[in-house]
């Protein structure tokens, strides 16, 4: 049984030997001539070389010791030792033979195993030479910096002002390591935080599950967020949330978005118009059967993907922008607006301080013949003799003629289809409407008074006054050439000679000028031409009482004429 197993193993080992080597082993040795010992030695060496792999494979087998006996192992060991000794002697004898040549890569056709066959390597240096650094140093920690002060600065900047550590150090470096100046700059800096709501985070996760890192498609599903904001949010949260577990799409294959896009292209559509969801003008509108309206393609894709309408704008979703803040300088007007929008209480005349109060008994009026009458119920007020019949909390009413029913009724009245003239129902009146009504009434009264005053003006006398003024103007224009021809008022040089005396005509003209211009001495002196400003002033001071009496008399005459 052992011999059978051994022969099988030998046969299996021979399979690893090439056909040429197997033929050389099985072939019988040819008879060699006695006078050629070198060829005989070479043939024996070749035979032993081809048989050596079989013996080495036997020695490496771990299971061969269990199947072979002790005698076979001893026999094989002796044969191996004899063959190795013969090969060593042959190698030593042929080392001095220069006629024998082999390839340089395999001189003796042996496997070089052992310390004597190892390559000789030069000893390496204990430490490599330092290569020049090609990086440019931007910042280095100063040796003289106080570490305790630095720790306090970072704690203050990151804890109180919510600045990142790298931002705080950047500010400190910009201020040349001056902690006080850096702290002042840190107080002025404000970090703009891009806060995401829970709904937006959930929507981003869903889109990332469908689209992967196709941020443009995610942006189409989240129009209220910019593309840079979406990318920044992804890189800020990729270390916290494991997005790799969400990806269910291959980049080179079609995804759900592409399939939806193909489906949308086959939906019912209409020509260009305005989207009923986002109110944006689009060249193509598609019918959304679920919402029963026409929407643009982005809104349709968003609805088919998320099953909710696409947000129209950032203002509609962001809570921070839903509430419009009123500027400080507008709060006064807002408070006044709220006050004026309160129901009217009938005290506008007292608030404005104009006009006269009058009693009104038409707060609520009902016309029986009016077809538009829709009373809400009887208006019953229980009151005593001392009580005010008008309730302060009752809203006053005003007429409204712009409703469709009122316009139709007025049209019927014009066509004489309605025989009665009804009173159109009134709407609630506010304080603002009440004050506007009082102001309009006061303006109408003032305009009426002005018209009546104008009608009482004596137009004929005013025309005569205009003629007198034109005559005085012409006289003044002709006054200078007339003075040149007289001997008292002119000289040879052509200049006007100032007369220091007052003639009766000059006194009369001066008093008339005082009637018109009162104490404008410069203008009066310019009109009279022969008197200086000092002379006019002196004349006024000497005759002030007489001049004032003449002015009062002149005004009284004007009032009496206007009163007629």
UniProtKB/Swiss-Prot annotation:
Question: Domain of life here?
Answer: Eukaryota
Q: Which GO terms describe its molecular function?
A: sequence-specific DNA binding; transcription corepressor activity; zinc ion binding
GO biological process terms held by the UniProt record = negative regulation of DNA-templated transcription; regulation of transcription by RNA polymerase II
| Occurrences of domain SANT (ranges) | 191-242, 497-548
SMART domains attached here?
A: ELM2, SANT
> Region Disordered: start and end of each range?
1-106
Q: Which InterPro entries match?
A: ELM2_dom (IPR000949), Homeodomain-like_sf (IPR009057), SANT/Myb (IPR001005), SANT_dom (IPR017884), Trans_reg/Corepressor (IPR051066), Znf_GATA (IPR000679)
Domain ELM2 residues, every copy: 109-190
The record's principal subcellular location, in a coarse class, is nucleus
List zinc finger spans: GATA-type.
275-299
* Swiss-Prot/TrEMBL keywords: Metal-binding, Nucleus, Repeat, Repressor, Transcription, Transcription regulation, Zinc, Zinc-finger
Family annotation (PANTHER family): REST COREPRESSOR (PTHR16089:SF28), REST COREPRESSOR COREST PROTEIN-RELATED (PTHR16089)
Protein family:
Belongs to the CoREST family.
Supply the name of the protein: REST corepressor rcor-1
Which organism's genome codes for this protein?
A: Caenorhabditis elegans
